[in-house]
């Protein structure tokens, strides 16, 4: 059950990202996920990959018979993709093994074949609605600016439950009655939806200047924009998105201060630890999102020439001068300081 909740939460956040914040994504420098093709390595953005999955599989997924498991399977595939364990849309992640490829390809094809739309039932007769359209309408109408006070932390939990019911066709939302919904459930669910709507007044936060309110989506978007966009998944980098998910969960529960926002049920004792945790993710993300050559060690060579060159020191984030003797070496070798900074660290200074 916990795994299902996490999968649902992941899909929930991804839909927010894809459908609610496209303009915030494109202007950010996006180094991407390093992948492996027959033509050689390439980089793909985490967001691009996830978007392609959602566009190709989730949009209009038909939820009938065993179809309720489709989005669960999709969430699992996305999780595998984030961990670099799956090939999707001809993209093979760098730590993916050939042995897994056929199975995952079949799994993806099965999901694609069942992508026929959500069958719903209206007074005017049956119609089909996209899962994303339905979920987006819920998020737009309820989640944006959900107020997290007293028992308000359960609002997003309740929202997730409603989304799960909608996916399984057990709830009527925004005048859409799903095909296996019963009239007996209608009034109760309508009240549940109204209760959530009434609490939609923003996240109450506490700053030095006094309390303020911030939208849940604004907070989550700022985290995703700052950490997840284009995160390169190498070595320990896979833990970045896991840590990000944990931070988002803490934020939803009001247990974390992020981007200058302190939630109202956050304690001062937790503040410093969580701030360090967020900073560590940002630093790890900076290193992980650089071209591979920037992470290569300094190599002076083995000949007798004397040339002034520059390399990027991943330990301190600076472009540093060194003496190169003219042979051997690697890609982390620049003739000009400007080239080093432009390639590896636009914010770096020099020594």
UniProtKB/Swiss-Prot annotation:
<dbReference type="GO" id="GO:0004867">
    <property type="term" value="F:serine-type endopeptidase inhibitor activity"/>
</dbReference>
<dbReference type="InterPro" id="IPR020901">
    <property type="entry name" value="Prtase_inh_Kunz-CS"/>
</dbReference>
<comment type="function">
    <text>May play a role in mediating maternal-conceptus interactions in the immediate preimplantation period. Does not seem to have proteinase inhibitory activity.</text>
</comment>
<feature type="repeat" description="3">
    <location>
        <begin position="202"/>
        <end position="286"/>
    </location>
</feature>
<feature type="disulfide bond">
    <location>
        <begin position="294"/>
        <end position="344"/>
    </location>
</feature>
<feature type="repeat" description="2">
    <location>
        <begin position="117"/>
        <end position="201"/>
    </location>
</feature>
<feature type="domain" description="BPTI/Kunitz inhibitor">
    <location>
        <begin position="294"/>
        <end position="344"/>
    </location>
</feature>
<dbReference type="InterPro" id="IPR050098">
    <property type="entry name" value="TFPI/VKTCI-like"/>
</dbReference>
<feature type="disulfide bond">
    <location>
        <begin position="319"/>
        <end position="340"/>
    </location>
</feature>
<keyword id="KW-0325">Glycoprotein</keyword>
<dbReference type="InterPro" id="IPR002223">
    <property type="entry name" value="Kunitz_BPTI"/>
</dbReference>
<keyword id="KW-0964">Secreted</keyword>
<feature type="signal peptide">
    <location>
        <begin position="1"/>
        <end position="20"/>
    </location>
</feature>
<feature type="repeat" description="1">
    <location>
        <begin position="32"/>
        <end position="116"/>
    </location>
</feature>
<keyword id="KW-0732">Signal</keyword>
<protein>
    <recommendedName>
        <fullName>Trophoblast Kunitz domain protein 1</fullName>
    </recommendedName>
</protein>
<dbReference type="Pfam" id="PF00014">
    <property type="entry name" value="Kunitz_BPTI"/>
</dbReference>
<feature type="site" description="Reactive bond homolog">
    <location>
        <begin position="304"/>
        <end position="305"/>
    </location>
</feature>
<keyword id="KW-1015">Disulfide bond</keyword>
<dbReference type="GO" id="GO:0005615">
    <property type="term" value="C:extracellular space"/>
</dbReference>
<keyword id="KW-0677">Repeat</keyword>
<feature type="disulfide bond">
    <location>
        <begin position="303"/>
        <end position="327"/>
    </location>
</feature>
<feature type="region of interest" description="3 X 84 AA approximate tandem repeats">
    <location>
        <begin position="32"/>
        <end position="286"/>
    </location>
</feature>
<feature type="glycosylation site" description="N-linked (GlcNAc...) asparagine">
    <location>
        <position position="265"/>
    </location>
</feature>
<dbReference type="InterPro" id="IPR036880">
    <property type="entry name" value="Kunitz_BPTI_sf"/>
</dbReference>
């Amino acid at each position: 059950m916990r795994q299902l909740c996490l999968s649902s939460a992941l899909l929930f956040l991804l839909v927010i990202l894809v459908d609610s914040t496209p303009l915030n994504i494109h202007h950010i420098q996006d180094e991407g996920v390093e992948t492996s093709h027959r033509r050689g390595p390439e980089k793909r953005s985490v967001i691009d990959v996830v978007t392609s999955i959602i566009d190709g599989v989730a949009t209009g997924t038909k939820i009938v018979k065993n179809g309720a498991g489709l989005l669960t399977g999709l969430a699992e595939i996305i999780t595998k993709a984030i961990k670099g364990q799956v090939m999707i849309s001809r993209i093979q992640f760098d730590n993916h093994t050939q042995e897994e490829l056929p199975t995952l390809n079949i799994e993806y094809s099965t999901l694609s074949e069942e992508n026929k739309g959500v069958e719903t039932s209206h007074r005017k007769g049956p119609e089909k609605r996209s899962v994303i359209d339905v979920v987006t309408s819920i998020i737009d109408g309820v989640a944006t600016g959900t107020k997290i006070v007293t028992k308000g932390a359960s609002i997003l939990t309740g929202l997730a439950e409603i989304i799960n019911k909608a996916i399984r066709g057990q709830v009527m939302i925004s005048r859409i009655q799903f095909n296996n919904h019963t009239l007996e459930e209608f009034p109760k669910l309508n009240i549940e939806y109204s209760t959530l709507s009434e609490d939609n007044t923003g996240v109450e936060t506490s700053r030095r200047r006094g309390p303020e309110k911030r939208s849940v989506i604004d907070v989550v978007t700022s985290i995703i924009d700052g950490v997840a966009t284009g995160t390169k998944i190498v070595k320990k980098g896979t833990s970045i998105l896991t840590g990000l998910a944990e931070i988002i969960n803490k934020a939803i529960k009001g247990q974390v201060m992020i981007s200058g926002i302190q939630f109202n049920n956050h304690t001062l004792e937790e503040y410093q630890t969580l701030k360090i945790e967020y900073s560590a993710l940002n630093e790890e993300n900076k290193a992980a999102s650089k071209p591979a050559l920037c992470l290569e060690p300094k190599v002076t060579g083995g000949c007798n020439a004397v040339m002034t060159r520059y390399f990027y020191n991943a330990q301190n984030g600076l472009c540093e001068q060194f003496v190169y003797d003219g042979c051997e070496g690697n890609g982390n070798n620049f003739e000009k300081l400007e080239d080093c900074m432009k390639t590896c660290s636009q914010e770096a200074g020099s020594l």
